[in-house]
């Protein structure tokens, strides 16, 4: 979820205007795919579906040279000089694991709504949940800084099913499959209808409202491309190189006095997930929209990403 100027996007149920435009042929195609995957899972269990996803990912890795090269270039761009110093994992191995991890996550995403709620939640291990709950207890909402690592579409569903009021940011040009699956989720899980989603190119008034109403707002600040000179950024050090990350949403959180945390989602074997919450990036009792505090928080955000990417290079989202 990459965002900087955000707001006034309607909740998912209202956003159904775009989803309603899906053609009947497109819907039929998605129904057939979902039916096949669910039938496979019923016959061979979720473990069987996971093995199918790994085989599918391996095949993609073998034949999709363009995407494989793009992922490897992304890794080189992220690690920079650290590659030459041998401070990062084997790129070839990370690329293969990325293809297999991503395909498995996508397969589960397609049939999540068909699984019993209890079965889903049993597959989630929440690390440092007490940090998030303590931040929410301050009644100022919570801003969770995300990054382009891991499957955020899985994360927001898990958080909603765990009972949290969550909000996020999405691109206006979402794919047809994502919109179709979103419809199915909203039909099955009432919690999904309470998720607030905003577009990434609109005015941020609603973000202030999210914090006032005690929501958990998550956006990613580590955008990989220039989104306009008018957007505020901060320069941070990451693997010995300078990176420019967006700062707008964090500044809004600072102005609202909302605790600022950082989160990651890690996909494990056989469709198990780890939700990881890091310590606050800013002392909640000293929050203020001051340049020094903002810069310190952004550098800590970058340091946490570097630590996470070094440990889970296959979780880079873009490939």
Residue spans for each PLM region:
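Non-catalytic C-terminal accessory region of glycerolipid acyltransferases
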Residues: 2-4, 81, 161, 201-319
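Active-site metal-coordination segments of metallo-dependent hydrolases
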Residues: 69, 171-175, 241-246
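Membrane-anchoring hydrophobic helices of lipid-metabolizing enzymes
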Residues: 2-146, 182-186
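Soluble or luminal CAZymes and related metallo-dependent hydrolases
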Residues: 32, 67, 124, 199, ...
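Contiguous, well-ordered alpha-helical segments that form the cores/surfaces of helical PPI scaffolds
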Residues: 130, 153-157, 250
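Catalytic core of membrane glycerolipid acyltransferases/transacylases, capturing the structured
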Residues: 103, 109, 138-200, 227-234
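Active-site glycine-rich loop that binds ribose-phosphate moieties when present
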Residues: 127-128, 198-202
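Short, flexible loop segments at the rims of nucleotide/cofactor-binding pockets, characterized by
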Residues: 118-124, 193-198, 238-240, 294
């Amino acid at each position: 979820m990459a965002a900087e100027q955000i707001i006034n996007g309607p909740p998912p149920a209202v956003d159904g205007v775009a989803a309603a435009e899906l053609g009947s042929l497109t819907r039929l195609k998605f129904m057939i795919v979902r039916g096949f995957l669910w039938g496979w899972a019923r016959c061979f269990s979720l473990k069987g579906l996971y093995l199918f996803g790994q085989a599918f990912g391996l095949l993609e890795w073998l034949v999709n040279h363009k995407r494989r090269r793009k992922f490897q270039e992304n890794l080189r761009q992220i690690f920079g000089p650290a590659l030459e110093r041998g401070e990062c994992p084997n790129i070839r191995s990370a690329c293969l694991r990325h293809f297999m991890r991503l395909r498995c996550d996508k397969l589960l995403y397609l049939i999540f709504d068909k699984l019993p709620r209890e079965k889903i939640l049993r597959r989630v291990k929440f690390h440092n949940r007490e940090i998030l709950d303590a931040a929410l207890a301050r009644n100022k909402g919570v801003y969770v800084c995300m990054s382009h690592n891991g499957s955020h579409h899985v994360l927001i569903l898990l958080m909603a099913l765990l009972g949290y009021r969550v909000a996020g940011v999405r691109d206006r040009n979402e794919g047809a499959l994502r919109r179709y699956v979103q419809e199915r989720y909203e039909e099955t899980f009432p919690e999904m209808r309470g998720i607030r989603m905003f577009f990434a190119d609109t005015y941020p008034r609603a973000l202030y409202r999210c914090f006032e109403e005690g929501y958990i707002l998550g956006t990613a600040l580590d955008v990989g491309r220039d989104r306009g000179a008018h957007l505020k950024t901060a320069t941070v050090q990451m693997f010995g190189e300078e990176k420019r990350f967006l700062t707008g949403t964090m500044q809004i959180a600072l102005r609202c006095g909302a605790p600022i945390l950082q989160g990651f989602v890690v996909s494990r074997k056989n469709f198990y997930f780890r939700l990881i919450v890091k310590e606050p990036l800013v002392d909640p009792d000293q929050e203020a929209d001051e340049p020094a505090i903002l810069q310190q928080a952004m550098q800590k955000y970058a340091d946490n990403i570097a630590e996470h990417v070094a440990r889970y290079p296959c979780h880079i989202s873009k490939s």
